[in-house]
Regions:
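Alpha-helical scaffolding segments of alpha/beta enzyme cores, especially the outer helices
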Residues: 36, 68-82, 106-113
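A short helix->loop->beta-strand "cap" motif at the edges of active sites that frequently abuts
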Residues: 48, 82-86, 120
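Catalytic His-Asp segment of secreted/periplasmic serine-dependent ester chemistry enzymes
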Residues: 93-174
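Conserved SGNH/GDSL esterase-like catalytic core that processes O-acyl groups on lipids
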Residues: 1-72
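Hydrophobic/aromatic beta-strand patches that form the interior of the parallel beta-sheet core
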Residues: 18, 88, 121-123
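Generic structural signal for well-ordered alpha-helical scaffold segments
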Residues: 35-39, 77, 159, 163
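Class I S-adenosyl-L-methionine
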Residues: 2-6, 81, 112, 116
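Active-site segments of SGNH/GDSL-like serine hydrolases
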Residues: 53-59, 76-106
């Protein structure tokens, strides 16, 4: 998030971020823990917002279906909505595994639908990156993980596909 925050042009807005990421976390795990951890960082004196960055971890669980993943994300978003917390949902990124990507495309579409139905901003990182040469090269050289170029692409997508809308700020013109 450092790249996104560093490039955010909003001199009248003070932004603080607290990363609560857990590697390989499923949507079920996220649903169970997010409020307890995030609520300790929220304040009644500030405008509180939440970024949820989803992964492909749900694909590794045989017991988790797309419907279950949808429900888990819906529960997170519904709880946030009940507390008037705007959420920016960043979808999962593609892998180099074509079979996994086929399943991930379905999950991405489901997540987009859930966020859209609840009027939360969704940044689709999967669709623009799945065939992106630089993304794929970065994953190939980093044992399947994005490096500098990959993180730059994700930051660009976030900044240009919902970040300012979610913050309620005009998009910069330059």
């Amino acid at each position: 998030w450092g790249r996104v925050l560093a490039r955010t042009q909003a001199p009248d807005v003070e932004l603080e971020n607290y990363v609560l990421a857990v590697p390989h976390e499923t949507t079920e795990d996220l649903n169970e823990r997010w409020w307890g951890e995030a609520s300790r960082r929220f304040s009644e004196e500030t405008e509180n917002r939440l970024v949820v960055a989803l992964s492909d971890a749900d694909l590794d669980l045989e017991a988790t279906s797309t419907a279950r993943s949808r429900l888990n994300l819906a529960n997170v978003l519904d709880t946030a909505s009940q507390r008037n917390i705007p959420v920016l949902v960043v979808g999962p990124t593609p892998t180099l595994d074509e079979q996994r990507n086929a399943r991930l495309a379905e999950l991405n579409a489901a997540y987009l639908d859930v966020a859209d139905r609840r009027n939360h901003v969704y940044v689709d990182t999967f669709t623009p990156l799945v065939g992106h040469e630089q993304w794929r090269a970065d994953l190939a050289s980093g044992q399947g993980r994005p490096g500098q170029a990959g993180h730059g692409l994700i930051a660009w997508l976030v900044l240009h596909r919902g970040w300012y809308q979610w913050l309620g700020l005009p998009e910069p013109t330059a």
